[in-house]
UniProtKB/Swiss-Prot annotation:
This is Kinesin light chain 3. Kinesin is a microtubule-associated force-producing protein that may play a role in organelle transport. Plays a role during spermiogenesis in the development of the sperm tail midpiece and in the normal function of spermatozoa. May play a role in the formation of the mitochondrial sheath formation in the developing spermatid midpiece. It comes from Rattus norvegicus. Keywords: Coiled coil, Cytoplasm, Cytoskeleton, Differentiation, Microtubule, Mitochondrion, Motor protein, Phosphoprotein, Repeat, Spermatogenesis, TPR repeat. Residues 90-150 form a coiled coil. Oligomer composed of two heavy chains and two light chains. Associates with microtubulin in an ATP-dependent manner. Interacts with KIF5C. Interacts with ODF1. Interacts with LRGUK. Interacts with VDAC2. The lineage of its organism: Eukaryota, Metazoa, Chordata, Craniata, Vertebrata.
Length: 505
């Protein structure tokens, strides 16, 4: 006799996929069925035992013993099934506990991960604020020390020309951060001394102070301080005023100045193109600041040897300055000098002579023949004549430069001004005459060498050639020439700012 117990709902065709809850429910039903079968088999085993204990035929006893063995075997199978079912139920309960614990731990891990992310973000924000605070503190300390130093120096300075009622208005501004060739060696104070005079746009004092700091750092070679300082200020301006704002263009010019000093001409050119676009949009295409940026771009292209690209930029800057400032303005003459240098590097000597001649006429009309800019322009024109082998014209220009009977006002006694004012002009022009004298000396050496067919002589021999052979004058004229040369030598030790060639070095 055998009894089979099937799970309710089972078709017997194969295993079915059940979820854990359904499996536990069916296992419990099977346990109940097995317990009922066990009770039934115990009852059968009892009846068989009673039957075997009573008298009966031998054949009947053998049959009863066989049935008893089958029942006992079934009881063993039922007990085994019950044990396995109990184990399954216990395992199911344990798995349920583990699953609940796993879900709890998983939720806790998610919460901890969120808290960790939040803490990381807070830490990064705190570190960023700390770095910004440290940079701000360092910047303020540097600015404080710089301003204290400037304050200590200011008490020894004479009154500035811009503070005297009889002085003409200055047009130096932060709009021209790459000065013209005559202005390139002026100090940072000259570059940031005044606001823009055209279009009603005034450079903020904060940017002028920042520009002075950047110039100071760059002159010391501390570009690792100057560049982050510029970039931080640029980001602050873009956040507060937007990208298309004149102050942003000014800041781009300052950063381009730092890159130019590092000989990173490509990066500086990109920044100046951005500044040019901003100034054209905000100030108009014919604003003096646009002309200054165009001139700066032309200077950069010239330093990179890209003279063809620089020339139209310089030409456009000239047209703007002629229209806004007038055809006889000093800035127009400076622009003509730059344009002449670009043309000279391209071999356009006819244009070079025309531009220098016009610049010379402007300087002579404004300052007379004693204006230092007249001597500089004549020296540049003489150099152009030398490159064309026009030795006679170059000799005449060098004679005019060296034979001036009267020197500029700062070299003699003050005429209608205080000694302090004259000394201030002397200091501003010292490097100008120093470089001019050196340039004239080199040009004269070339001229004498070519005229006489000799090699370049030393400095001592050159002085004799200049006095005896090249000038070829005598009497009072020779004395005046010698006196002028002596004055020019003295000027090289006392006077200031000069031109720089646009050609690459």
């Amino acid at each position: 006799m055998s009894v089979q117990v099937a799970a309710p709902g089972s078709t017997g065709l194969g295993p079915e996929r059940l979820n854990p809850e359904e499996l536990v429910r069916q296992t419990r039903q099977v346990v109940q069925g097995l317990e009922a079968l066990r009770a039934e088999h115990h009852s059968l085993a009892g009846h068989l035992a009673e039957a075997l204990a009573g008298p009966g035929p031998v054949a009947g006893v053998e049959l009863l013993e066989e049935k008893q063995q089958v029942v006992n075997h079934s009881l063993e199978a039922i007990e085994l099934g019950l044990g396995e079912a109990q184990v399954l139920l216990a395992l199911s309960a344990h798995v349920g506990v583990l699953e609940a614990e796993k879900q709890r731990l998983r939720a806790q891990a998610r919460r901890l991960a969120q808290e960790n992310t939040w803490l990381r973000e807070e830490l990064e924000e705190t570190q960023r604020r700390l770095r910004a605070s440290e940079e701000a503190v360092a910047q303020l300390e540097e600015e404080k020390s710089h301003l204290q130093f400037l304050g200590q120096l200011r008490q020894y300075d004479p009154p500035e020309e811009s503070q005297r009622p009889d002085s003409p208005p200055r047009r130096d501004s932060l709009a021209s951060l790459f000065p013209s060739e005559e202005e390139e060696k002026k100090g940072p104070e000259a570059a940031g001394a005044a606001a823009a005079q055209q279009g009603g746009y005034e450079i903020p004092a904060r940017l002028r102070t920042l520009h002075n700091l950047v110039i100071q750092y760059a002159s010391q070679g501390r570009y690792e301080v100057a560049v982050p300082l510029c970039r931080q200020a640029l980001e602050d301006l873009e956040r507060s005023s937007g990208h298309c704002h004149p102050d942003v263009a000014t800041m781009l010019n300052i950063l381009a100045l730092v890159y130019r000093d590092q000989n990173k001409y490509k990066e500086a050119t990109e920044l100046l193109h951005d500044a040019l676009q901003i100034r054209e949009q905000t100030l108009g295409p014919e604003h003096p600041a646009v002309a200054a940026t165009l001139n700066n771009l032309a200077v950069l292209y010239g330093k990179r040897g890209r003279y063809r690209e620089a020339e139209p930029l310089c030409q456009r800057a000239l047209e703007i300055r002629e229209k806004v400032l007038g055809a006889d303005h000093p800035d127009v003459a400076k622009q003509l000098n730059n344009l002449a240098l670009l043309c000279q590097n391209q071999g356009k000597f006819q244009d070079v002579e025309r531009h220098y001649a016009r610049a010379l006429s402007i300087y002579e009309a404004l300052g007379g023949p004693q204006d230092p800019n007249v001597a500089k322009t004549k020296n540049n024109l003489a150099s152009a004549y030398l490159k064309q082998n026009k030795y006679q014209q170059a000799e005449e220009l060098y004679k005019e430069i060296l034979s001036q009977e009267a020197l500029p006002a700062p070299l003699g006694a003050p005429q209608g001004g205080t000694a302090g004012e004259a000394q201030q002009q002397v200091l501003r022009r010292s490097s100008s005459f120093s470089k001019l004298r050196e340039s004239i000396r080199r040009g004269s050496e070339k001229l004498v060498s070519r005229l006489r067919g000799e090699s370049m002589a030393g400095a001592a021999g050159m002085k004799r050639a200049m006095s005896l052979n090249m000038l070829n004058v005598d009497g009072p004229r020779a004395a005046r020439m010698q006196l002028s040369t002596q004055h020019l030598n003295e000027a090289s030790r006392t006077l200031s700012a000069s031109t720089q060639d646009l050609s690459p070095r």
